[in-house]
Amino acid sequence: MNSSCKTRVFNIISIIMVSMLILSLGAFANNNKAKADSHSKQLEINVKSDKVPQKVKDLAQQQFAGYAKALDKQSNAKTGKYELGEAFKIYKFNGEEDNSYYYPVIKDGKIVYTLTLSPKNKDDLNKSKEDMNYSVKISNFIAKDLDQIKDKNSNITVLTDEKGFYFEEDGKVRLVKATPLANNIKEKESAKTVSPQLKQELKTTVTPTKVEENEAIQEDQVQYENTLKNFKIREQQFDNSWCAGFSMAALLNATKNTDTYNAHDIMRTLYPEVSEQDLPNCATFPNQMIEYGKSQGRDIHYQEGVPSYNQVDQLTKDNVGIMILAQSVSQNPNDPHLGHALAVVGNAKINDQEKLIYWNPWDTELSIQDADSSLLHLSFNRDYNWYGSMIGY
């Protein structure tokens, strides 16, 4: 081949190689742009500080997938690929924060649960964040609300007061979960505003927490689950004081395998002379809980403290219902939910650790938390001490 031909071939090869390089660089740039665009659309939640105690991080990573699988099983949902978002905090409008950390749990790209790490027992409330023992809980708390705005490039602050939980975005405050109080109006928009101090702290302290997927080891972490065979959630408490009525109805429906019980009818039986208008304000006392259970053929007795994991396991196998009696740690006499009742649904072993499954009448799904925790961090930013149980429903 003469030199001119060699030169021509070399030039052609050079042109082809340069073209391929340009195309590959373009594809690389477009790919990076797509990733950046996708990343920019992630929901961001404002926090004062992104510093999370290492024990909280470790517990969340170790526990979230097993908890999610166990809760999926309770709702007969298919398991999937579980991932953990970043921790966020919830603030009062004056800037105070609560003592818990919240993680969005993501399954197949959708926020399905919220993992909550809160003080384990009453003594932990007085300890520092680093020294505190934490209880792990999973529920659907505000998960659907977060998922609805997950891909809308939103930047929010999660707030709370006695009426419920709110999302603040661009100066607008929106109620997403209302407290079950009598005469509480479910206002979608609120005139409340974030305090200037909190605004400044959120603005200057750190970058927001991103609700994004983090890879985690996926293992079969649920070793055992045992629940009341026929337990179903049929109703939800909102604008009344009937937590014990809801809990008794749910437990009796489960253990008798029926759907004849409901909270209203139980409260009407307990308060036959009270008007319908005043009935929502009526609460239930321990002697009424025992007497109503007996009237339905159940031998109810009160037991102090939290029942052991083994006791819950055996009672659940025997189709015997347990009602939780809890009291607000704050002891605020003006709190309409100073006392609260919940239904134990069963127990589980996740990562070789003992858990209890329960239903809070304020919620539409079950919750799971550590069996050795006497504190219940419930949906409306309240810590309750589990002081006793009614057994036998």
UniProtKB/Swiss-Prot annotation:
GO terms for biological process: proteolysis. Prematurely activated/folded staphopain B is inhibited by staphostatin B (SspC), which is probably required to protect staphylococcal cytoplasmic proteins from degradation by SspB. The record marks E219, D220 as: Cleavage. Proteolytically cleaved by staphylococcal serine protease (SspA). It comes from the Bacteria. GO terms for molecular function: cysteine-type peptidase activity. Its EC number is 3.4.22.-. Keywords: Hydrolase, Protease, Secreted, Signal, Thiol protease, Virulence, Zymogen. Residues 1-36 form the signal peptide. The active site is at C243, H340, N360. Pfam families: Peptidase_C47, Staphopain_pro. The keyword DNA-binding does not apply. Belongs to the peptidase C47 family. The cascade of activation of extracellular proteases proceeds from the metalloprotease aureolysin (aur), through SspA to SspB. Cysteine protease that plays an important role in the inhibition of host innate immune response. Degrades host elastin, fibrogen, fibronectin and kininogen. Blocks phagocytosis of opsonised S.aureus by neutrophils and monocytes by inducing their death in a proteolytic activity-dependent manner. Decreases surface expression of the 'don't eat me' signal CD31 on neutrophils. Cleaves host galectin-3/LGALS3, thereby inhibiting the neutrophil-activating ability of the lectin. This is Staphopain B. The lineage of its organism: Bacteria, Bacillati, Bacillota, Bacilli, Bacillales. The gene is sspB.
